[in-house]
Design a protein with these regions (language model features):
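Basic/polar N-terminal segments that are highly enriched at the extreme N-terminus
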Residues: 1-2, 164
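Acetyl-CoA-dependent GNAT
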Residues: 3, 7-94, 99, 112, ...
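Conserved acetyl-CoA pyrophosphate-binding loop and the N-cap/start of the following alpha-helix
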Residues: 102, 106-114
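Short polybasic/polar patches that bind polyanions
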Residues: 103, 120, 145
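Conserved beta-strand-loop-alpha-helix junction that forms the acyl-donor binding cleft
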Residues: 103, 128-140, 158-162
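Short coil/turn segments at alpha/beta junctions that flank glycine-rich nucleotide-binding fingerprints
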Residues: 105, 122-125
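Conserved active-site alpha-helix within GNAT-family acetyltransferase domains
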Residues: 109, 125, 133-153
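Terminal substrate-recognition subdomain of acyl/acetyltransferases
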Residues: 146-147, 155-164
């Protein structure tokens, strides 16, 4: 499969929103099952709206966020977004998504490698990414481990203070 990786364009936003909603659809039911309806509803009352807003923000935030798109036959099939902190020589991957029809074909791996090379060319010495520890994030963890990231297990706790 021959795909190209290129910088995001203004006309990509709508496609990247749709792609990300499909790619992350399995994640939110997993979160809901783990957290329960109460806490889940407090964090993500409408996960689709939250994701749409996040994607729209990174696509228009060219001064702060770098976004690259994987394109196959003129169609966006994946993307990666990261932020550079040149003062600290660090970078953080904020988002990585591959359309479900194109997952497990090396697109996420290629996007990671491409972004890591651009980071290194910018003088970055340390890259980081956060991802979930739940079963729905297993493919993401494999992708990051394949790219050479080292995991630091963390636990995040939530407490619903609206309960009596």
């Amino acid at each position: 499969m021959d795909f190209a990786i290129r910088p995001v364009r203004d006309d990509d936003t709508k496609d990247l929103v749709q792609l990300s909603l499909l790619a992350w659809a399995p994640v939110f039911p997993s979160f809901k099952q783990m957290l329960g309806d109460g806490i889940y509803g407090l964090i993500w009352p409408d996960w689709r709206a939250s994701q749409r807003e996040a994607i729209e923000q990174v696509c228009k935030d060219g001064d702060q966020t770098t976004v690259y798109v994987a394109e196959l036959d003129g169609t966006a099939v994946g993307f990666i977004a990261y932020v550079l902190n040149l003062k600290d020589k660090t970078a953080e991957v904020q988002l990585l998504a591959v359309h479900p029809d194109h997952q497990n074909l090396g697109i996420g791996t290629a996007l990671n490698a491409y972004a890591l090379n651009r980071m290194k060319e910018s003088g970055v010495t340390l890259a980081r990414v956060d991802t979930g520890g739940d079963p729905s994030h297993a493919p993401a963890r494999r992708c990051y481990e394949k790219a050479g990231y080292t995991a630091l297990p963390l636990v995040r706790y939530f407490k619903d203070l609206t309960e009596r």
